[in-house]
C-alpha cells in the first residue's frame, strides 16, 4: 500500500465523562487532528431489534502508524464523511509500525 491511497479524512473521537449534577454523562469529543485514511466498506446488513429495523455497515480504515494512532482503542470512535463509526478492532496488517487497520461499524440509515 502507498500513501497515495489515503484519500479520506477521519476524525477520531474520545469519550469524556462529565457530571451534569444529576448523573455522569459520557460525551464524545474530537481527539487530535484529522488523519488521512483509506476507506473500504466490507459488509452491510439489516437487523431487527426491539421493533425497529436498523441498517448497518462495517468498514475498514487504514491509517499510517504513529504514536497518536497507535493510542486508539475500541473505546474510541471515528467520523468520516459525516458518519460516526464505532471501532471494533485495530491491528497492524503488514510490516512493523507502517500502517494500522481499523475495523469499525456504523448505522447506515
Please identify what each model-predicted range represents.
Residues 4, 25-109:
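Short, conserved turn/kink motifs that form compact alpha/beta structural patches or helix kinks used as
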Residues 1-25:
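Active-site-proximal polar cores
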Amino acid at each position: 500500500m502507498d500513501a497515495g491511497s489515503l484519500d479520506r479524512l477521519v476524525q477520531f473521537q474520545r469519550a469524556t465523562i462529565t457530571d451534569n449534577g444529576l448523573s455522569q454523562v459520557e460525551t464524545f469529543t474530537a481527539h487530535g487532528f484529522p488523519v488521512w485514511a483509506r476507506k473500504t466498506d466490507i459488509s452491510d446488513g439489516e437487523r431487527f431489534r426491539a421493533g425497529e429495523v436498523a441498517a448497518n455497515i462495517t468498514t475498514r480504515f487504514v491509517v499510517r502508524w504513529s504514536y497518536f494512532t497507535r493510542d486508539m482503542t475500541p473505546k474510541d470512535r471515528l467520523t468520516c464523511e459525516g458518519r460516526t463509526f464505532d471501532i471494533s478492532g485495530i491491528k497492524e496488517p503488514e510490516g512493523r509500525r507502517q500502517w494500522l487497520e481499523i475495523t469499525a461499524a456504523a448505522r447506515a440509515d
